[in-house]
Amino acid sequence: MPARRRWFENRPMLKRIVLAVLALVILPYVLIFFYLLPFIHPVSTLMLRDLVLLRGYDRRWVSLDQISPALVQSVMMSEDGQYCFHGGVDWAEMRMLVEDTLKGQATRGGSTIPMQTAKNLFLWNSRSFVRKAMELPLAVSTDFVLSKRRLMEIYLNIAEWGPGIYGVEAAAQHHFKVPASKLTRRQASLLAVSLPNPIDRNAGKPGRGLRRLAGVIERRAQGSGEYIKCIYE
């Protein structure tokens, strides 16, 4: 037995730690295949955190067919206009993000819906290069394994829309007292633009800036036909 391997074998605690870390790294890629099954309703790491802290949360799973198309269109135009055309990562956007960072300029988020879904399902919420490095391969894998419809369905059912409010059905009921299937274009656009910061941006009580931004997204959503074909064709 080589000396290096013998050194490792003689340290059972270190061996267990390494194996545990490897299992945690591999587990998300295994779970992605389980999420192919439509009757499995994934939860996010934020939901698990709320359970551990005994806060509880409101999430009511609905299928994509039970969600207003206006909401899907608004979220795509607000969060990821190239959703139907990339493979999980918008590399052109990522390149500009890296260039801005190297220049010391303020950066945009650069996260696609698959990247946000991977983060919500498997990673933590704070921004860091370590998290982003883990997020990229998970996003590509998620986009490759899941259909665009299934991926969108999962995203809209785990996204945070306020303290303890997860998923579009709970958000629609909480902010507008209607089911997700009955959201108007204005309500849908308000929910969409609140996604980047749902704690500070209240879709049910929007300020002037949020209403103005929602108006922009509402107009984009109305002309989004070519951009949403992977969802509704």
UniProtKB/Swiss-Prot annotation:
One GO-annotated biological process of the protein: peptidoglycan biosynthetic process
Residues annotated as transmembrane: 17-37
Record's bilayer topology term: Single-pass membrane protein
A Pfam family per the record: Transgly
GO CC list: peptidoglycan-based cell wall; plasma membrane
Gene Ontology MF, one: peptidoglycan glycosyltransferase activity
Cell location: Cell inner membrane
Keywords, alphabetical: Cell inner membrane, Cell membrane, Cell shape, Cell wall biogenesis/degradation, Glycosyltransferase, Membrane, Peptidoglycan synthesis, Transferase, Transmembrane, Transmembrane helix
Domain of life of the organism encoding this protein: Bacteria
Known catalytic reactions: [GlcNAc-(1->4)-Mur2Ac(oyl-L-Ala-gamma-D-Glu-L-Lys-D-Ala-D-Ala)](n)-di-trans,octa-cis-undecaprenyl diphosphate + beta-D-GlcNAc-(1->4)-Mur2Ac(oyl-L-Ala-gamma-D-Glu-L-Lys-D-Ala-D-Ala)-di-trans,octa-cis-undecaprenyl diphosphate = [GlcNAc-(1->4)-Mur2Ac(oyl-L-Ala-gamma-D-Glu-L-Lys-D-Ala-D-Ala)](n+1)-di-trans,octa-cis-undecaprenyl diphosphate + di-trans,octa-cis-undecaprenyl diphosphate + H(+)
Pathway: Cell wall biogenesis; peptidoglycan biosynthesis
Principal subcellular localisation of the protein: membrane
EC number of the protein: 2.4.99.28
Enzyme class name: transferase
Function (record text): Peptidoglycan polymerase that catalyzes glycan chain elongation from lipid-linked precursors.
PANTHER family: BIOSYNTHETIC PEPTIDOGLYCAN TRANSGLYCOSYLASE, MONOFUNCTIONAL BIOSYNTHETIC PEPTIDOGLYCAN TRANSGLYCOSYLASE
Similarity remark: Belongs to the glycosyltransferase 51 family.
Record protein name field: Biosynthetic peptidoglycan transglycosylase
Organism per entry: Rhizobium etli (strain CIAT 652)
